[in-house]
Amino acid sequence: MNYSYSFKEYIERFAKKVNSIDSEYFEFSSYIERMRTVFGLLIALICFSNVLCFLFIATWFSTKGFGQHYRALIFTLFIPFVTSLLANIIFINLNRAFREYFKISSKSRSFLVICAFSSLPIVNIWLMLWWVAMIKRFTSNYAFAIFDKYNGLTSGVFIFDFADNVNFEGKLVSFDNTKDTNRDFVHFYSEAKLKRDKITLQTNPIPHERMYVNRMYYQQKLSMGANQNSPSTAFANLKRYVEHKQQKIIKIKQFILT
């Protein structure tokens, strides 16, 4: 059995699409790492600002003579605010990922507003919680969007010409009778037919196989050509590869939500 030219051509086009999504996936993973670092340090600064504030307030109430003047209260709130503000200005100014995310310039007013608001004691606790929720929502939606692109590569009904005289019809369907309802499969019907005469080509057609929608034949690079007498080998290899890839995506989702 040899591959027809149309099948090889289709696989090449498909591989290019998967390569494109792969690039987006790895760029997204790297972006998540950077953003977690950026926001993690910024949240640490917010916590530091509030700790300073509470320490000064505790000192103001517990020390005799320290709280006799209004200047003491101003001093109490001014010190942690200025300390945190300077730290935020330096930190945000040096962090390109943060500025790109909020689309701000170090010369714009929004830059100073973000620095000042994140430095306000107590008030910035709400900002910290809002940032955490926003990051989770954004990254989770982004992750699912990429995951859907993988699943959407082979939607619909299509024909694969595995050999000169044999074709398999593949249809995107849900795999019933299984607890795993989150995956779709491509069912291949081993209808071995002679194209010219439309009659049965062989009495023992290749057994019915099912294949995951994601990453169809990409990793194998037409490896079935090396296993011409055992097409199921390619299916088994593909299944293991895709399951490994799905586990990585699940880990990314868990990483996002922690």
Swiss-Prot record:
| Keywords tagged on the record | Cell membrane, Membrane, Transmembrane, Transmembrane helix
Q: Which domain of life is it from?
A: Bacteria
Q: Where in the cell is it found?
A: Cell membrane
Q: What is this protein called?
A: Uncharacterized protein MG256 homolog
Q: Which ranges does the record mark as transmembrane? A: 38-58, 72-92, 111-131
Describe its membrane topology.
Multi-pass membrane protein
The Gene Ontology CC terms held by the record are: plasma membrane
Species this chain originates from: Mycoplasma pneumoniae (strain ATCC 29342 / M129 / Subtype 1)
Where it mainly occurs, coarsely classed, is membrane
